[in-house]
């Protein structure tokens, strides 16, 4: 499965936030955007702002691919209800993101690796597709041998119970979690490492699908 393999620190510096939760914050040494003119601020066009919001959303969920953005938008654009809410939910309820939200991994990239390497179960069955969409009532757990991974243990130990979103429940002692309800847009946005104008992203995609 394709995934982003580019420089993650440059992405974090571009947006001025340690969005990937790395222990070595890339902003400590270079708190400005990358590039020769990183210290200068340029006024962006409307198109430039749309591109930036799109890139921010992709970064918040582990550098998801362009085709995944387009696919998610096509799946919700003609449905009844809030398009922006349903669109954002497509990424928040991805299996890799839920593994991260439940504290089984320190970063979204570590969560992607756990899923891809077959460490994760959904309703008791192995699922190794990172983009698998969870629905309310679905349970996420780790395989018995995977619970012994030092990285998993450390991640859960460092995760405060109060930091879990209200739309999930987590049983740390049994390495299990459950998506309780479909999260609202404001609940999802509260979990993002930086603000994203999702309506701008949807407007951008509406002209390209």
From Swiss-Prot:
Classification via CDD domains: S4
Coiled-coil stretches noted in the UniProt entry, renumbered to this chain: none
Entries under InterPro entries matching the protein: Ribosomal_uS4, Ribosomal_uS4_bac-type, Ribosomal_uS4_N, S4_RNA-bd, S4_RNA-bd_sf
Domain S4 RNA-binding: 93-156
A GO BP entry: ribosomal small subunit biogenesis
Annotated Gene Ontology cellular component terms: small ribosomal subunit
UniProt keyword terms in alphabetical order: Ribonucleoprotein, Ribosomal protein, RNA-binding, rRNA-binding
PROSITE patterns on file: S4
GO molecular function: rRNA binding; structural constituent of ribosome
Function: One of the primary rRNA binding proteins, it binds directly to 16S rRNA where it nucleates assembly of the body of the 30S subunit. With S5 and S12 plays an important role in translational accuracy.
Assembly and binders: Part of the 30S ribosomal subunit. Contacts protein S5. The interaction surface between S4 and S5 is involved in control of translational fidelity.
Protein family according to the UniProt entry: Belongs to the universal ribosomal protein uS4 family.
Protein name (database record): Small ribosomal subunit protein uS4
Organism: Chlamydia abortus (strain DSM 27085 / S26/3)
């Amino acid at each position: 499965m394709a995934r982003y393999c580019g420089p993650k620190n440059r992405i974090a510096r571009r947006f001025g936030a340690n969005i990937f939760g790395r222990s070595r914050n890339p902003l400590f040494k270079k708190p400005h955007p990358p590039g020769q003119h990183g210290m200068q601020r340029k006024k962006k066009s409307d198109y430039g702002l749309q591109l930036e919001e799109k890139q921010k959303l992709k970064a918040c969920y582990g550098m998801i691919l362009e085709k995944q953005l387009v696919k998610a938008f096509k799946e919700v654009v003609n449905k009844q209800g809030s398009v922006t809410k349903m669109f954002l939910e497509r990424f928040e309820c991805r299996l890799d993101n839920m593994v991260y939200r439940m504290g089984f991994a320190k970063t979204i990239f570590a969560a992607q690796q756990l899923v891809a390497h077959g460490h994760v179960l959904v309703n008791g069955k192995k699922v190794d597709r990172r983009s698998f969409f969870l629905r309310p009532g679905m349970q996420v757990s780790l395989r018995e041998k995977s619970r012994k991974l030092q990285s998993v243990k450390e991640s859960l130990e460092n995760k405060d119970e109060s930091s879990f979103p209200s739309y999930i429940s987590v049983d740390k002692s049994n390495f299990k979690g459950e998506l309780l309800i479909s999260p609202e847009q404001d609940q999802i946005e509260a979990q993002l490492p930086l603000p994203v104008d999702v309506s701008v992203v949807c407007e951008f995609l509406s002209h390209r699908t």
